[in-house]
Amino acid sequence: FALNPLANERPAQFPSDVRDLMAWVSGTSLPEKHPFSRLQAFPQGDTVPEIWILGSSNYGAQIAAHFGVPYCFAWFFTDGQGAEQALDIYRQTYQPCDRHPKPHTGLCVWALAARTDEEAQFHYSSRAKWRLFRDRGVFLPIEPPRAAAAYPFTDSEEERICLDRATAFVGTGKKVAAQINALAEDHGIDEIAVVTWAHDEEA
């Protein structure tokens, strides 16, 4: 609770929450009148966790730049929309600190790899249907790919799924790695994080 109380009700408080977290993980004191000034994080080790800001907007980039911490753009959340602008803002307004004298950037992408392109696309069917409904505000469970592929999509839905497939990081491991590395190079990225979900984790 102390890390992020009422997060959805007070987004303007986010900078203060980041400041508090940085103090707790480093073992430094908060202001005396702070409601959690007596709270300490345990155990305290010889090293300090590295704090990143994961965001999909300019606001997150500005916060990361202000505190001098690494910034990771949530590519998987927006399909990259806004990434270039957010990364530019972060780099241009970055305030150096001892641990990070220079801006340090990342991208978090959704990817799925398999032994063949066909197998990867088959398993992607689960996400394709899930995402189609998510964009309508309907959150379905991840279905088996065979069931998802058999769903009677309309022509417009099929068109949307085809567009999604064209930009998704899906295929053989070699193909997906090449796509992600090219993306990182295009945007001057230091690190890549990958998220994946499928109906069967052993697929």
List where the protein language model places each region:
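An alpha-helical appendage that flanks or caps ligand/catalytic pockets
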Residues: 5-40, 81-187
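A conserved active-site cap/scaffold subdomain adjacent to cofactor or substrate pockets
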Residues: 57-81, 86-87, 100
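Flexible loop/turn segments at secondary-structure boundaries
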Residues: 60-61, 80-81, 113-116, 200-202
